[in-house]
Each structure stands twice: as C-alpha cells, then as structure tokens.
Amino acid sequence: MTNKNAYAQSGVDVEAGYEVVERIKKHVARTERAGVMGALGGFGGMFDLSKTGVKEPVLISGTDGVGTKLMLAIKYDKHDTIGQDCVAMCVNDIIAAGAEPLYFLDYVATGKNEPAKLEQVVAGVAEGCVQAGAALIGGETAEMPGMYGEDDYDLAGFAVGVAEKSQIIDGSKVVEGDVLLGLASSGLHSNGYSLVRRVFADYTGEEVLPELEGKKLKEVLLEPTRIYVKAVLPLIKEELVNGIAHITGGGFIENVPRMFADDLAAEIDESKVPVLPIFKALEKYGQIKHEEMFEIFNMGVGLMLAVSPENVERVKELLDEAVYEIGRIVKKENESVIIK
C-alpha cells in the first residue's frame, strides 16, 4: 500500500486538494493589485508596502468568520456569496480604523474536500476582495475528516490594511455635537444567526413572507454583507470623518460606543433608522422585545459615521447614496447609547 492510498483511506483526498488550487487560480487573479509579490502557492504571501505611496504607514489588521450563517449556506446549498461575507466582516472592521485594505488570506476547513463547492466559496472570497480593493495573496484549505461532517465546512479570514499615521481613526476626534450618519446595510450581514436560525427553524427557506416584499426567505437570510471600503475611503482621505462604527454582533448598543471616549454618548432618533423588512419579520415571528433588537442586529445601518456638523454636506456629496442622519454625540449621563 502506498502512502497516498493510506492517506486516502483515512479520508484525505490529496488529489482533490490539488484540483481546488487549480480551480481557484482564475478567481485569485481577479484580485491582484499593486504591491503583490510572488505567485499563489508559496509558503507565504508577500506584499511590497512601498507601492502604496503612504508616507507614514501604520498597518491595521483584522480577522473574523461568518458565524452560523455558514449553517444556512450549507442547508440551502448556496456557497457563492458566503466568502464575500467573510471578507466584509474583516475589511469593514479595519476601515473603521481608517485603513485601506491591502491584502487578505482565507482559511477553509472541511470534512470532505469537494472541489466544485470550495471553488464557489473562494470565488465569493475573491469577489469580496475585488469590492474591497484587497489582493487575495494566500490561504489554507484543510480537509479534516472526523473533525467535521462531510458536508460541513468553516471559513475564516484575515485582512491587513494601511493608514497614514495622521489619518488613523481611533475615536479621539469625536466630540459633543458631532452628527451621526448611518449607511444602509444590505440585510442581516453576518451577525445574530444563532437567533435567526432558531426563529426560522421550521421554515424551508422557500417561503415568501409578507414582510419580505416578494423575496424568498432564504434569499434574504443569505444576502451578502455589504462592503463599505470604496464608499468610505474618500471620506478618510479628506479627513471628513471623526469616528466610524461597524455595526456587527451586539448591534447599536455594543458597537456604537467603540468609536468615542467614555465621557460621551450617542443619542439615536429611532424614527430616522431605515429598518429593513427582515428585522420587522424577526421581531414579529421571534417575539423579540423591540429594545432587544438594537442589542443584537444592525437594524438597517451597517456602518455609522461621526461627522462634524460643517462636514455633513460634503460627506453626503461624496457618498452619493442615501445617508441617514440618525443622531448626534452628547455628553454621557448614564447610558452610552440612548435610543429615542
């Protein structure tokens, strides 16, 4: 018996691994940008920082996964957008610190290497990288029979970006009186899915609920996370933004205070929040307390900006999309987030 056959008998298909690498090369090629060095398949991805033109570069990194949204991708056998979710969760975090994404690495672990399915996953990662302007310079596909079921896989990513030292966004510039601007989310993004799956546990996904405006439930649940990089980078370059909050797990309550000092608070006008239909459906069918919704979900706002009043119109002009004035920064009395 050869070593190859012995490994195959243990459940690891080396040939399938080689096939995945060949399948994903064309997707990775879409993401190439200035600064990328070397070819796919090396022991480490390389990037030439001098190509960015940044005078005082500060590297900013982020890592994340997509949580149990993956379980719905597996359930509905739809794998071509979950990679975008993974990229979005990482790059939206680093853009909140003022970083331009440079490169991305992914990690996929599975019980059985199915090249066609994994190609779809990585194609989604590549699409996310294109939207973020980041190069996919490396990754790992691990086949682990016994650790995962044959149909199961997990996905994680790691993003690295760069910022001018003078343009880092760390919350220190946010002051009382700043206007809070909300940028629309595409849906649930990639948070709260353990609760979402419980609420819709008895649904097939084919249902068209009256609240969802003609869309199938599974389409809404797997809507890919919006990537805000190209919208927000011009604002950072012009130094128009004092603070940025990526609204992820923990909703408004946990994430908004991360962009300002402890002596400040965010006062939110709930009537200005563009609540999406899926959140109304979740509140109704899950019998979730209304105030708790803001502690879990983005409620239709995926990114929040703190902007000086005199810069609001210029920010709106550059964004060229619906921008929601949802509140302001005030002196903290009790709570860090006040929703009225």
Curated annotation (Swiss-Prot):
Catalytic reactions of this protein: 2-formamido-N(1)-(5-O-phospho-beta-D-ribosyl)acetamidine + ATP = 5-amino-1-(5-phospho-beta-D-ribosyl)imidazole + ADP + phosphate + H(+)
Principal subcellular localisation of the protein: cytoplasm
InterPro entries per the UniProt record, alphabetical: PurM-like_C_dom (IPR010918), PurM-like_C_sf (IPR036676), PurM-like_N (IPR016188), PurM-like_N_sf (IPR036921), PurM_cligase (IPR004733)
Organism: Streptococcus pneumoniae (strain Taiwan19F-14)
Example GO BP: 'de novo' IMP biosynthetic process
Keywords: ATP-binding, Cytoplasm, Ligase, Nucleotide-binding, Purine biosynthesis
Listed GO MF terms: ATP binding; phosphoribosylamine-glycine ligase activity; phosphoribosylformylglycinamidine cyclo-ligase activity
Alphabetical list of CDD domains matching this protein: PurM
Family: Belongs to the AIR synthase family.
Listed GO CC annotations: cytosol
Source organism, top-level taxon: Bacteria
EC identifiers of the protein: 6.3.3.1
Pathway per the UniProt entry: Purine metabolism; IMP biosynthesis via de novo pathway; 5-amino-1-(5-phospho-D-ribosyl)imidazole from N(2)-formyl-N(1)-(5-phospho-D-ribosyl)glycinamide: step 2/2
Ligase is among the record's keywords: yes
Localization annotation: Cytoplasm
Name of the gene: purM
Protein name per UniProt: Phosphoribosylformylglycinamidine cyclo-ligase
